C-alpha cells in the first residue's frame, strides 16, 4: 500500500475510535488539500529530517511524507494514534518514526542524528503551542532550518506583529530576534474536526543568519515579560521589577539602551528591546562579579 492508497482520514478516525480530546487541545485537520499546502511551505525536503508534534490521525503526516521528506519523526503523547501512524509508516516505506511522549520534554537533537537539515512542521496543540515555540527559539544554536507552525490566529498574529500593532508583545520580540517570521496561511475553524472556536493560521519561521541572531534569550524574556506585563505603564514603571532582579534601576537600563523612559513597550522596536536585554545582562553579571 502507498500513501495515496490509505483510507480517508474520517474512516481512520472511525475505525480506530480516535475522537479528539479537549484535554490535549486536539483539533484534526482532515482536508488533504490544506495539509499539502502546509507541507509545501517547508520547501524541498528530499534530504531533510522532518519533525511533527501532535500528528494525531496523521493528516499533516501524510502530506509531509507525500511531499518527499527523507524521514519524519512524529512526537505524539496520545497512544491511541500509534496504530494509525504505524499504517502510515508502512505506506511510506518506513520513513516515519514515532516517539511517544511529551514534546516539551523531548530532546529533538538526540533523536534527529542523521544527515540532512532539520525542519519542523506541526499543527500545534492549542494548549502548548507557545511553550513549544519558545523552546525551539531558545535552542543554541538553532538546530532547524525552517519551522512551519499552525497556531490559533491570535497567537500567530502575536508572532509576526510589528511595533505599534495591537498584537505586538513578548512573542514577537523573541521570535523576530531569532528568525524571520511571516504569516503564510489562514485556516478557517470549519476546516477542523471538531471545529475550534477560533480561526488558525500558519506561520513560517526561518532562522536569521548566525551573526544576526540575538543570543541571550533569557535576558530578552526577562525584559519583555516585565515591559509587556504592564504594557499601559511607561517603561520607567514597567521595567522596575526586571531592573531590580538585575541589580539596577529602570532609569539606568533605559539610559544605557538609549530609550525614552516615558515611552510604552508597544512602541519600542526589536533592536530597542535587544539593547535593554544587553544592559540588563551587563548589570546582572556585574552584580555577581
From Swiss-Prot:
CC per GO annotation: cytosol
EC numbers: 2.1.1.182
Compartment list: Cytoplasm
Amino acids binding S-adenosyl-L-methionine: 27, 29, 54, 76, 102, 123
UniProt feature coiled coil, ranges: none
Cross-referenced SMART domains: rADc
Gene Ontology MF, one: 16S rRNA (adenine(1518)-N(6)/adenine(1519)-N(6))-dimethyltransferase activity
InterPro entries: KsgA/Erm, rRNA_Ade_diMease-like_C, rRNA_Ade_Mease_Trfase_CS, rRNA_Ade_methylase_Trfase_N, rRNA_adenine_dimethylase, SAM-dependent_MTases_sf
Main subcellular location of this protein, as a coarse class: cytoplasm
Keyword vocabulary terms for this entry: Cytoplasm, Methyltransferase, RNA-binding, rRNA processing, S-adenosyl-L-methionine, Transferase
UniProt enzyme class: transferase
Catalytic activity reported: adenosine(1518)/adenosine(1519) in 16S rRNA + 4 S-adenosyl-L-methionine = N(6)-dimethyladenosine(1518)/N(6)-dimethyladenosine(1519) in 16S rRNA + 4 S-adenosyl-L-homocysteine + 4 H(+)
Keyword Membrane: no
Family listed: Belongs to the class I-like SAM-binding methyltransferase superfamily. rRNA adenine N(6)-methyltransferase family. RsmA subfamily.
Role, per record: Specifically dimethylates two adjacent adenosines (A1518 and A1519) in the loop of a conserved hairpin near the 3'-end of 16S rRNA in the 30S particle. May play a critical role in biogenesis of 30S subunits.
Protein name: Ribosomal RNA small subunit methyltransferase A
Species, as recorded: Maricaulis maris (strain MCS10) (Caulobacter maris)
Taxonomy of the source species: Bacteria, Pseudomonadati, Pseudomonadota, Alphaproteobacteria, Maricaulales
Gene name per UniProt: rsmA
Amino acid at each position: 500500500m502507498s500513501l495515496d492508497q490509505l483510507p480517508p482520514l474520517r474512516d481512520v478516525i472511525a475505525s480506530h475510535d480516535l475522537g479528539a480530546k479537549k484535554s490535549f487541545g486536539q483539533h484534526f485537520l482532515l482536508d488533504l488539500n490544506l495539509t499539502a499546502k502546509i507541507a509545501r511551505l517547508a520547501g524541498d525536503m528530499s534530504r531533510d529530517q522532518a519533525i511533527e508534534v501532535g500528528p494525531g490521525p496523521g493528516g499533516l503526516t501524510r502530506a509531509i511524507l507525500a511531499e518527499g521528506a527523507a524521514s519524519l519523526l512524529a512526537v505524539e503523547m496520545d497512544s491511541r494514534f500509534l496504530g494509525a501512524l504505524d499504517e502510515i509508516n508502512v505506506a511510506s516505506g518506513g520513513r516515519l518514526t514515532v516517539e511517544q511522549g511529551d514534546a516539551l520534554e523531548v530532546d529533538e537533537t538526540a533523536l534527529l542524528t542523521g544527515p540532512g537539515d532539520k525542519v519542523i512542521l506541526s499543527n500545534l496543540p492549542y494548549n502548548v503551542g507557545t511553550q513549544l515555540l519558545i523552546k525551539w527559539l531558545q535552542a543554541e544554536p538553532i538546530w532547524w532550518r525552517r519551522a512551519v507552525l499552525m497556531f490559533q490566529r491570535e497567537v500567530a498574529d502575536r508572532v509576526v506583529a510589528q511595533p505599534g500593532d495591537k498584537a505586538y508583545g513578548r512573542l514577537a520580540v523573541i521570535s523576530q530576534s531569532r528568525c524571520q517570521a511571516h504569516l503564510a496561511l489562514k485556516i478557517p475553524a470549519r476546516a477542523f474536526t471538531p471545529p475550534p472556536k477560533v480561526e488558525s493560521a500558519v506561520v513560517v519561521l526561518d532562522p536569521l543568519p548566525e551573526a544576526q541572531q540575538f543570543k541571550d534569550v533569557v535576558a530578552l524574556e526577562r525584559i519583555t515579560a516585565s515591559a509587556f506585563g504592564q504594557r499601559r505603564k511607561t517603561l520607567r514603571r514597567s521595567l522596575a521589577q526586571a531592573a531590580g532582579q538585575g541589580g539596577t534601576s529602570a532609569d539606568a537600563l533605559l539610559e544605557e539602551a538609549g530609550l525614552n523612559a516615558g515611552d510604552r513597550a508597544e512602541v519600542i522596536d526589536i533592536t530597542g528591546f535587544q539593547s535593554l536585554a544587553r544592559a540588563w545582562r551587563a548589570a546582572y553579571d556585574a552584580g555577581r562579579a
